[in-house]
Amino acid sequence: MNHALRWTAGAGLLLACLVQGAFAERLLLQVEDFDGPWRRQTNIAGYLGTGFCTSNANPKIADVVMRKTATLKEPGRYAVWVRAYTSENSRRALQAEVNGKRLAVTHKDRRRRWVWELAGTLDLAAGPVEIVIHDADVGFESADAILLTSEKDDDPMADEKQWLLYPDKLPDQANALRFNIEACLALTKERRDAASKEEWEARRKSVAAELQKALGLDPWPERTPLNPRVTGRAEREAYTIENVVFESRPHFCVTANVYVPKGGPTPRAAVVVVPGHAMKEGKNYDLYRLGELGLVAQGFTVLAYDPIGQGERQLRGYSHAAGYAALLVGWTNEGFIVWDTVRAIDYLASRPDVDPKRIGLTGNSGGGENTFYTMPIEPRLAAGASFCFVCSYHDWVKDGGDHCICNHMPGILRHMEEFEIVGLNAPRPFLAGNGAKDPIFPIAGTRRTMERARAIYALQGAESSLRQVDVPLPHGWAQPLREAAYGWLSKWLLGKGDGSPVPEPKLQPDDLASKDLYCLKDGKMPADALSYAALIRAEAERLIAAYPPMPAEPAERANWAKALRERLWQTLGGEPPARAEARSLGTFAWEGHSVERLAIQTEPNLEVPALLIRPKGAAARTPAVIFLDDAGKEAARSSSLVGGLLRSGIAVLAMDPRALGEGAVHLNHCASDAVLLGRPLLAQQAWDAICAARYLKTRPDVAGDRVAAYAHGNVGLIATLAAALSHDLSAAATDGAPGSLVAAIADPLPLPQWAYAANVLKAADVPQWIALCARRPFLCVKPPAAGAPPPPADATLSFLLAALKPR
């Protein structure tokens, strides 16, 4: 017998069936109905019931459990299955316990998916049975359901596996992360060394211009009043701490500590120190304060500030994750941090005790990144020292792993490699210091980049102004690297020494809790302060307000649509070569319908999984609907819309665009590498839908002039963009998709990372995408407002049936 699971939104489902003359029992329990402190969540699509539960002990193993007592009607030998979520970047193992007996640890796998795993078998009596779920590893363990079954050979995965093309392992040809990494590497290999000074000078201008664009600083922001204010001052034996708040943009406040040495001549040389990803401590992180005070001991005035999302700016509306929202308007996290640094230099230059011709910049990790990107565009910097960042894009993308979105500038790999960015500094002094055991920025890439940059410095006779230092240590601003900063900056800004490391004196930093280290004495921004997210939203609204209206006259409207479509393609990285191919991986029967597993080729070396469901008794050529769902293509099994389409004789192609559903990969890693590539993941996914439509049109059993798309949830953005970019879809309907990308701008992010396409709002918002579908049927069903009745359940079905009638 095929005992496929059927589930509802209820607390549990009890099924009993007769097997070989004996009663067998199946008890399905939803973990969200267990008792315990694990957090109830719904943010990962594909769960059963009404949600799932997540342990919050990360990065420790929780000592709290989820517990439920249920009742078995029949005694017998029971298999205990656990359904939970696994992912490649997190250790999420669980352990089930039944009536005090702990079973095998499950979900050690590192593949991104919901999956049933067998925990063990045991003999159970009829009556009460207690089930306990334990955390068994250091990730965010996410438990969905428990199944106790005494049915012989019962496998809850058997039915699910039919709907999977890759039940055991995601192959390389379906791995969107691999695809984006390889595409990035192909671009980095195109960068060549300049053969002459003349060649470099010609290239230098374009590299500088493209860097400014990639950072989101083209045009330059206006240098508005800094409105600096000192909120506190504290005396120490050798220096004074000044707590300073300034505005890098109107009402956008930066919190900074200025350390002023006591004694010595003025005006002094100064150094801006930008911290790395010390999210809680920011400028006050222990290793960074040691570096700040070490520079003060050399005689520098030091300004250390909190980048967005760190230290005193670790507030709602300021997080690094909002950098995805910034991409929509053509801004970047790093561009904002670079501009904060430029304004910090403005502030230092305004002080009478600072020599504006002797200002330097340094930082580690994210601060090394800021040094790397700020120095080429800020000519007032007399010297720079970047630590634990400089690498090569090639080695960093290939071996460095996942990164914060602040490291990713849109399309930058199309225009430069890191050695060229370092070369923009020539002949000004620049030092790169790294840990040889740094897994994030492989040292081979650092050495290669600095060697290639040295050739550019040599063209200007400035080889002595460039230095690379590495130490046998992992990632971090360790003492040997801090000492390298002291010596390098002292040589070029103080005229002391030969640039070799200077021993760090014994330092006595304040306790982290000292109020003298904080600018916001009440922990709050000024009442009129604007957050990062607020600035992004305002820019989005400004861009949208400037869109030209769609012309009323048909000929002008056609020209408008053609121009806008071309601009969208250009913004999204260009239209790839057309494809309309697929390979069949077999068929199976489902409720009388025929289901064909298809791997649709959407790129020369990438495929996406799909299932073509042909209705029973179908005509020789049927219309078709491409089905997308946030929960993945398997959601077609329980979709009433799919059922209605099949009963009406319409085929359904349920597919997973790249990086989603069965093809899920580490989303931040994949989406951020797509940013570097200059082909946003949303645009790639829309291309998958376009290729699927083109493939369907080649099939003899599909009416090629009647291929529509339906999308439920956020994936409606994919369907809408696909319909806007291509006429291959004759109609489209979305249910629950955002009606504007302005809705995607918030902190925390309201949409998944794949939805944030760099620069797209400079071209068009969702209403303009829909306008490009004019003359084709388009339905956008939005979630009803509070208190409003929902739309009729069959409204979308009626729309699609009408849209797919023969013309």
Question: Where are each of the predicted segments found?
Answer:
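Extracytoplasmic
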Residues: 24-156
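N-terminal secretory signal peptides that target proteins for export/translocation
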Residues: 1-5
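Alpha-helix capping and helix-loop boundary segments enriched in small/acidic/polar residues
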Residues: 279-290, 325-339, 361-372, 396, ...
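Primarily recognizes the serine-hydrolase "nucleophile elbow" in alpha/beta-hydrolase
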Residues: 346-414, 692-763, 769
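Alpha/beta-hydrolase-fold serine-hydrolase catalytic core, especially in secreted/extracellular enzymes
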Residues: 155-254, 426-609, 613-623, 631-637, ...
